[in-house]
Amino acid sequence: MTSKIIVALDFEKEAEALALVDQIDPSLCRLKVGKEMFTTLGINFVKQLHQRNFDVFLDLKYHDIPNTVARAVRSAADLGVWMVDLHASGGLRMMEDAKKILEPYGKDAPLLIAVTVLTSMEDLDLLQIGINASPMEQVLRLAHLTQRAGLDGVVCSPQEVEILRNACGEDFKLVTPGIRPIGTDFGDQRRVMTPTAAIRAGSDYLVIGRPITQADNPAEVLRSINVSIG
């Protein structure tokens, strides 16, 4: 499966989520399950997505002591997810332990990526938590730490992609939320870009939610975005 699109499932009810999922083609996208849905619906929901042949990005952004995060990552691998993430701000040792625990899974291990700076955060937000740096400076710092830990890549806003691609190389995966097709609402994302521009900048995977999930014809919107990014 070669699609670069990850559809973010942000629903309150399982039936609503599955109604959307059953309208789209697993060969054209992967699916992201975040904290709200996973807390409400649990692993059985992920299993239902797997039964429909979708790859799943388990977006739980683990951030805890190293042993706890490593064991959580192992549980995600046992569940069979395609990708799982953690917060780079948890530190080098936390990331290294999470990566090491996946070694026995070999080629079946999920991609392990780190969250750098949330796309809703701006300079003032960082300053309020004691970080006297711009979002780009902090992203670059945490991306280098992630790479040092041996992880597969990072989540970053599309505006940071080109700099990170140059800084971290071609094999480092860049996963970008904040993707909005032309003419759609920016929602709660502050640093946004169109799908075509994000791919041109060097993104590997595009996380897109409401422009697809709230569309009158989700399958057609998904098809159109795939066509636009080639």
Swiss-Prot record:
SUPFAM superfamilies: Ribulose-phoshate binding barrel. Disulfide bonds: none annotated. One of its GO terms (biological process) is 'de novo' UMP biosynthetic process. It catalyses: orotidine 5'-phosphate + H(+) = UMP + CO2. The keyword Endoplasmic reticulum does not apply. Pfam families: OMPdecase. Substrate binds at residues 10, 32, 59-68, 119, 180, 189, 209-210. The keyword Transferase does not apply. One of its GO terms (cellular component) is cytosol. InterPro entries: Aldolase_TIM, OMPdecase, OMPdecase_AS, OMPdecase_bac, OMPdeCOase_dom, RibuloseP-bd_barrel. It is an enzyme of class 4 (lyase). The active site is at 61 (proton donor). Pathway: Pyrimidine metabolism; UMP biosynthesis via de novo pathway; UMP from orotate: step 2/2. Its EC number is 4.1.1.23. SMART domains: OMPdecase. Keywords: Decarboxylase, Lyase, Pyrimidine biosynthesis. Belongs to the OMP decarboxylase family. Type 1 subfamily. Catalyzes the decarboxylation of orotidine 5'-monophosphate (OMP) to uridine 5'-monophosphate (UMP). NCBIfam families: PRK00230.1 (NF001273), pyrF (TIGR01740). PANTHER family: OROTIDINE 5'-PHOSPHATE DECARBOXYLASE. Homodimer. This is Orotidine 5'-phosphate decarboxylase. It comes from Haemophilus influenzae (strain ATCC 51907 / DSM 11121 / KW20 / Rd). The lineage of its organism: Bacteria, Pseudomonadati, Pseudomonadota, Gammaproteobacteria, Pasteurellales. The gene is pyrF.
